[in-house]
Swiss-Prot record:
The lineage of its organism: Eukaryota, Viridiplantae, Streptophyta, Embryophyta, Tracheophyta. Residues 1-72 are annotated as: Disordered. Pfam families: AP2. Probable transcriptional activator that binds to the DNA sequence 5'-[AG]CCGAC-3' of the cis-acting dehydration-responsive element (DRE). It comes from the Eukaryota. Belongs to the AP2/ERF transcription factor family. ERF subfamily. One of its GO terms (cellular component) is nucleus. It is found in: Nucleus. This is Dehydration-responsive element-binding protein 2D.
Length: 261
């Protein structure tokens, strides 16, 4: 009997311990969600009442002199800035000596950006949004109503022949068309001395030339004799249909015209 009791005791001692029951599925899912939030650095979203209490507590911590969009530097100055609601862009408004001045700057910027939807620090002292958005107009002194109307009215001038009816082509065709235009060549008027029948001597007297004198500048015309040696005047006059009319005989009988002889 003693041996049998010992065998039973050994069997009881070698039996595996019982496992604890698994936790419910809802508690495990909540725990995993909480761990994921802690890993990402997110905080649980409070309800409306909790959010209002949190904002009130933060406002109480900042003190009675704290305003929206205003914070104090360590050396005592106050700075003001504003963020755009949708874009998140921050606009720097400046540094001020007091918190009230910084708050007023924030109110002005918020009213210009958000309009009537802006939440202001001093709603009773803020200017209307229309006055902020509209630019200041400085009227010049001593301006009569007629002068002001003439200056503000746009100047409308219509060039003759540039009306819409003149610009639009008939039948909807093109206004500007390409056309062959021949150049107009006007004959040059002859000097009055040649028109009166005067010759080279008359021209010399008119221009105060000393024709018989030995004028050094007249030597420049000697190069015409060398040039005339290489010109075929008959061929040029035949191709160009040139006619020498109403010229004095002394001019026509120059070395340039007698090369073919």
């Amino acid at each position: 009997m003693a041996a049998g009791e010992g065998d039973v005791g050994m069997e009881v001692e070698t039996k595996a311990p019982a496992m604890p029951p698994p936790p419910p599925a809802s508690s495990s899912a909540a725990r995993k969600k909480k761990q994921a939030r802690a890993k990402n650095g997110d905080t649980p979203e409070p309800d409306a009442a909790g959010g209002a209490r949190a904002r009130a507590s933060r406002r109480a911590k900042r003190g009675p002199g704290s305003y929206r969009g205003v914070r104090q530097r360590r050396w005592g100055k106050w700075v003001s800035e504003i963020r755009e609601p949708n874009r998140g862009k921050r606009h720097w408004l400046g540094t001020f000596g007091s918190a009230v001045d910084a708050a007023l700057a924030y109110d002005k910027a918020a009213a210009s950006i958000l309009g009537p939807r802006a939440v202001l620090n001093f709603p009773a002292f803020s200017p209307p949004a229309a006055a902020i958005a509209a630019p200041e107009q400085c009227e010049p002194p001593f301006c009569s109503p007629a002068t002001t109307a003439a200056a503000t009215a746009p100047e409308q001038r219509q060039t003759p022949g540039c009306s819409p009816a003149a610009v639009a082509g008939s039948g909807g065709g093109a206004v500007f068309e390409e056309r062959d235009v021949k150049p107009v060549v006007l004959p040059l008027p002859l000097p009055a001395i040649l028109q009166d029948g005067g010759g080279t001597e008359a021209m010399a007297q008119h221009w105060d030339w000393e024709w018989d004198a030995s004028w050094p500048e007249l030597e420049m015309f000697e190069c015409l004799d060398d040039i005339a040696m290489y010109l075929d005047v008959d061929a040029v006059m035949t191709t160009r249909d040139c006619k020498v009319e109403e010229l004095d005989a002394d001019i026509v009988d120059s070395p340039l015209w007698t090369l073919s002889d």
